[in-house]
């Protein structure tokens, strides 16, 4: 890759990172191109050059946040020996349990994306692609657990659809600050569903063991995510 291309890609990532922060804080309707440019330390003209309009910026910002999520969790999940532990860690990361408050920013962007998808075919296409990837990730772990006898026999794709929908629904309540649905409660409800449908035992003690295993595998000794 040429130095110019590297610089161009770096600027684009810088703008996307800024867009995630600003849209999560203000919402897409109240976010202007200048707001993103100011956060990124660049000009509005450059933001328009890369993305053209806000809907494109939203979709690409969420895709950027999605890639960041997979990059942060892939190593931690892969390092765990059992499919059950990999599923537990994947769900924990999606619930942002034990993470900083702004680690839930991606879910705030999803709300804006869902609101726009019915009226914008491009946004709808991006939404569908990200959901397919997420469900496939869940289904892959389920099939691995079925192959080792850890999980009960069921349709992995249908289970992934149900779990993905449950996570989405509970995440909305967390974003809305529902007093009955904290991130920890979201995680517990998701894991109760996983354990019941897949036929394995899960307790908070199980989660502590998974967290310790993730920390041992992380280069700096901290849980990934």
Where are these regions (language model features)?
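Small-residue (primarily alanine) positions within well-ordered alpha-helices
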Residues: 18-19, 40, 145, 160
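Generic hydrophobic, amphipathic alpha-helix propensity
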Residues: 11-20, 36, 61-65, 69, ...
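Residues in soluble alpha-helical coiled-coils and helical-bundle/repeat scaffolds
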Residues: 2, 52-56, 78-82, 118, ...
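Hydrophobic/aromatic-rich alpha-helical bundle segments in the mid-to-C-terminal region
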Residues: 4, 124-128, 132, 146-194, ...
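Short coil/turn segments at alpha/beta junctions that flank glycine-rich nucleotide-binding fingerprints
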Residues: 25-29, 79-80, 148
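Hydrophobic alpha-helical connector segments
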Residues: 60, 74-107, 159-163, 187, ...
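Helix-turn-helix
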Residues: 14, 22-56, 60
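Amphipathic alpha-helical segments used for helix-helix packing
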Residues: 86, 101-124
């Amino acid at each position: 890759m040429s130095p110019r291309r590297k610089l161009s890609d770096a600027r684009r990532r810088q703008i996307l990172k800024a867009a995630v922060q600003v849209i999560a804080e203000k919402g897409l309707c109240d976010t202007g191109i200048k707001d993103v440019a100011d956060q990124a330390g660049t000009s509005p003209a450059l933001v328009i050059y890369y993305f053209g309009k806000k809907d494109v910026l939203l979709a690409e910002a969420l895709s950027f946040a999605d890639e960041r999520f997979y990059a942060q969790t892939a190593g931690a999940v892969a390092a765990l020996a059992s499919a059950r532990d990999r599923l537990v860690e994947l769900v924990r990361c999606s619930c942002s349990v034990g993470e900083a408050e702004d680690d839930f920013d991606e879910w705030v962007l999803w709300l804006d994306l869902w609101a726009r998808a019915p009226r914008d075919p491009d946004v709808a296409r991006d939404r569908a692609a990200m959901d397919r990837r997420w469900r496939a990730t869940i289904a892959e772990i389920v099939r691995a657990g079925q192959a080792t006898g850890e999980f009960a026999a069921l349709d992995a794709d249908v289970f992934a659809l149900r779990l993905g929908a449950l996570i989405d629904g509970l995440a909305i309540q967390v974003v809305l600050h529902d007093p009955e649905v904290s991130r920890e409660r979201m995680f517990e409800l998701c894991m109760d569903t996983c354990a019941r449908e897949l036929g394995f035992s899960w307790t908070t003690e199980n989660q502590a063991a998974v967290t310790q295993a993730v920390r041992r595998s992380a280069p700096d000794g901290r849980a990934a995510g």
